[in-house]
Amino acid sequence: MTHQTHAYHMVNPSPWPLTGALSALLMTSGLTMWFHFNSMILLMLGLTTNMLTMYQWWRDIIRESTFQGHHTPVVQKGLRYGMILFIISEVLFFTGFFWAFYHSSLAPTPELGGCWPPTGIHPLDPLEVPLLNTSVLLASGVSITWAHHSLMEGHRNHMLQALFITIALGVYFTLLQASEYYEAPFTISDGVYGSTFFVATGFHGLHVIIGTTFLIVCFFRQLKFHFTSSHHFGFEAAAWYWHFVDVVWLFLYVSIYWWGS
């Protein structure tokens, strides 16, 4: 490594942003192909390239931070600001879905029967699976906070147990959501109700899967002693993201499931 007189991390040229962007293009194109032509080839190719990109990009970041010592306090501060800005951009992303929902539901057009839910739509009972999902995510918020405090206090085994519980709850939430979609009495093509419901809850479900993946990486890193009580931004970022996913679900539950039904 060449000598440098500053604390910043000059990242080496990396192919992963490009392969990540191309895999995202393949996935979105593949999703369209699946919807319209019932072909999953492009979607599977996109998912495979996305998984490979994620694995290698995470591997490089772990090498730079844990083994090469590039993540100085100054670099960590920059990463913190970056994560905060990313979460703010995600808030604005979901604001669009809530806007679409309230725009349609607060002043239903005559085509919808002048009422909400629209005529012919039988909404899901908010006191059944959605309420269970809410309690599952709230419990996972408690367990990840337990994991964070255990890590800061140096209780390695407690941290692993709490993180495992959080991951298990995240997987359970995803399975419950999938079963709810499978049994729902309406589809994404059932007018504005179906499209706003499935797009908003579907993107939230995607974020839960991303957050769970993030936590699984942290779990394996903790098994390999990568985190210390004072140097663990990878886990901290995952925890922030998970709390964001929690809060979005509370808004979805109150707006779409409870008030919207």
Curated annotation (Swiss-Prot):
EC number: 7.1.1.9
Location(s), subcellular: Mitochondrion inner membrane
Catalytic activity: 4 Fe(II)-[cytochrome c] + O2 + 8 H(+)(in) = 4 Fe(III)-[cytochrome c] + 2 H2O + 4 H(+)(out)
Principal place of residence: mitochondrion
Mitochondrial matrix topological domain residue ranges: 1-15, 67-72, 153-155, 224-232
Transmembrane segments: 16-34, 41-66, 73-105, 129-152, 156-183, 191-223, 233-256
Matches recorded under InterPro entries: Cyt_c/ubiquinol_Oxase_su3, Cyt_c_oxase_su3_dom, Cyt_c_oxidase-like_su3, Cyt_c_oxidase_su3-like_sf, Cyt_c_oxidase_su3_a-hlx
This protein's GO CC annotations: mitochondrial inner membrane; respiratory chain complex IV
Known role: Component of the cytochrome c oxidase, the last enzyme in the mitochondrial electron transport chain which drives oxidative phosphorylation. The respiratory chain contains 3 multisubunit complexes succinate dehydrogenase (complex II, CII), ubiquinol-cytochrome c oxidoreductase (cytochrome b-c1 complex, complex III, CIII) and cytochrome c oxidase (complex IV, CIV), that cooperate to transfer electrons derived from NADH and succinate to molecular oxygen, creating an electrochemical gradient over the inner membrane that drives transmembrane transport and the ATP synthase.
Oligomeric and partner information: Component of the cytochrome c oxidase (complex IV, CIV), a multisubunit enzyme composed of 14 subunits. The complex is composed of a catalytic core of 3 subunits MT-CO1, MT-CO2 and MT-CO3, encoded in the mitochondrial DNA, and 11 supernumerary subunits COX4I, COX5A, COX5B, COX6A, COX6B, COX6C, COX7A, COX7B, COX7C, COX8 and NDUFA4, which are encoded in the nuclear genome.
Record's protein name: Cytochrome c oxidase subunit 3
Organism: Tragelaphus spekii (Sitatunga)
Gene: MT-CO3
